[in-house]
Amino acid sequence: MIGRISGLLLEKFPPLVLVDVQGVGYEIDVPMSTFYNLPAVGTQITLHTHFVVREDAHLLFGFATEGERQAFRQLVKISGVGARTALALLSGLSVADLHQTVSNQDPARLIRIPGIGKKTAERLLLELRDKLDLGVSAIPGAAGARRPSTMGSDVLNALLSLGYNDREANWAVSQLSVDLSVSDGIRQALKFLSKEK
């Protein structure tokens, strides 16, 4: 129904962004891989979208690439994997990394992602085994490419494992410079969080 949104980026608060299109503000949930690569507020952006209609809500999910959206659509088709779980997977792994994880049948890599238990990881690997494309073909040079925001995902996972909630962890990661190492990113994020308390 809504396949793409182009407009002015008004607000960024992980994992939500607010995009103004002709005076209408759309709240869009995005994976952290997309969030980390967004331009500054006040800039024109285009997101590939997936629209979900539920009894209690209409939800819009946005992705920087068509490959991310295709992977999201494959993930939500799996029994027990909802939109939020699919978003968490794409926040913790790039599409290329997810493809590699499925190819290698590596459940340990999936279990590190918040909200993914052993049974869900095994079901994901089983059901995705025959659907290995996962949108990777839509990403130029994606065969083994790591997205630049892997550091952010690693820091996010570290903060969540230390007991910070999603909101705190995502906020702290959004404050980081993208050129930090993972260990420096964790140190800096912990400093941000200690100042907020």
Curated annotation (Swiss-Prot):
Main location per the UniProt record: cytoplasm
Keywords: Cytoplasm, DNA damage, DNA recombination, DNA repair, DNA-binding
GO molecular function terms noted in the UniProt entry: ATP binding; four-way junction DNA binding; four-way junction helicase activity
Annotated spans, Flexible linker: 143-153
Keyword S-adenosyl-L-methionine: no
Region called Domain II, residue ranges: 65-142
InterPro entries: DNA_helicase_Holl-junc_RuvA_I (IPR013849), Hlx-hairpin-Hlx_DNA-bd_motif (IPR003583), NA-bd_OB-fold (IPR012340), RuvA (IPR000085), RuvA_2-like (IPR010994), RuvA_C (IPR011114), RuvA_C_sf (IPR036267)
Subunit structure: Homotetramer. Forms an RuvA(8)-RuvB(12)-Holliday junction (HJ) complex. HJ DNA is sandwiched between 2 RuvA tetramers; dsDNA enters through RuvA and exits via RuvB. An RuvB hexamer assembles on each DNA strand where it exits the tetramer. Each RuvB hexamer is contacted by two RuvA subunits (via domain III) on 2 adjacent RuvB subunits; this complex drives branch migration. In the full resolvosome a probable DNA-RuvA(4)-RuvB(12)-RuvC(2) complex forms which resolves the HJ.
Entry-linked HAMAP family: DNA_HJ_migration_RuvA
Function: The RuvA-RuvB-RuvC complex processes Holliday junction (HJ) DNA during genetic recombination and DNA repair, while the RuvA-RuvB complex plays an important role in the rescue of blocked DNA replication forks via replication fork reversal (RFR). RuvA specifically binds to HJ cruciform DNA, conferring on it an open structure. The RuvB hexamer acts as an ATP-dependent pump, pulling dsDNA into and through the RuvAB complex. HJ branch migration allows RuvC to scan DNA until it finds its consensus sequence, where it cleaves and resolves the cruciform DNA.
Protein's recorded name: Holliday junction branch migration complex subunit RuvA
Gene designation: ruvA
